[in-house]
Amino acid sequence: GAELNVVSGAALLGLRTGIISKLPDNSLGIYAKNRVRFCGVSDDYLVYDKEEDARLGIYFYENGAYPRKPSVVYDRRHASFCKINETEVPDSMYANTACFHTSGITLALSENTREVAIDMIKKFKAQGALISFDVNFRGNLWTGEEAKECIERILPYVDIFFCSEDTARLTFLKEGNVKEIMKSFTEEYPISIVASTQRIVHSPKVHTFGSVIYLSLIHI
């Protein structure tokens, strides 16, 4: 998912990376594990669900055709990952990590993944790791109000924050220009870096992408 994209990119830059997840102990789980390895990412923190009904969460992406937008259908409820327990991973992981990254998709999947992720964030932070978080809001997984309430619980621990301009306005009810919006997050929370994507939609298949980063000198 989104987190694997991030650690795969970091691995390409020569960093040692790993991913925390729970996979079904079957052929699909083995395939997913091998794809993780293929990306140069360690599978040391993958755990396995040995139940007979264990399943791998999937989603379906449908391309858009003007004027209809692309759409995504998630089929991830009751997936093995939604049953992950932090006692399944070694405690040594927290002290051996320089940066922990997760996203709003993980928080939105289930109440269990939400609470496990929040607890892990606190433990990584207590051991001195940087916390990186991407809102990655998905309206078909949870509402804006649910996302805002949950994410505001973890923002006091976040060092690097990814949030699109649209999400900042619609979910966090921010106002002003992009710089003012990004700066406001660093004023309200001890966030060092805010990164935002900027997208201009020309058609369902043609988008122009840009990005902007706000660096807070207060929290460096």
Question: What are the functions of these language-model segments?
Answer:
Residues 218-220:
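Conserved small/polar residues in nucleotide/adenosyl-binding loops
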Residues 128-132:
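Short beta-strand/loop segments at the ligand-binding rim of alpha/beta enzyme cores
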Residues 127, 141-215:
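Conserved phosphate/ATP/ADP-binding segment of small-molecule kinases
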Residues 77, 105, 136-140, 166, ...:
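Active-site beta-loop-alpha junctions enriched in small/polar residues
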Residues 5-16, 38:
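Alpha-helix C-terminal capping segments
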Residues 106-115, 143, 171-173:
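Glycine/threonine-rich flexible loop motifs
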Residues 16-104:
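Conserved N-terminal subdomain of the carbohydrate kinase-like
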Residues 11, 37, 122-126, 155:
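Anion (oxyanion) recognition and catalysis
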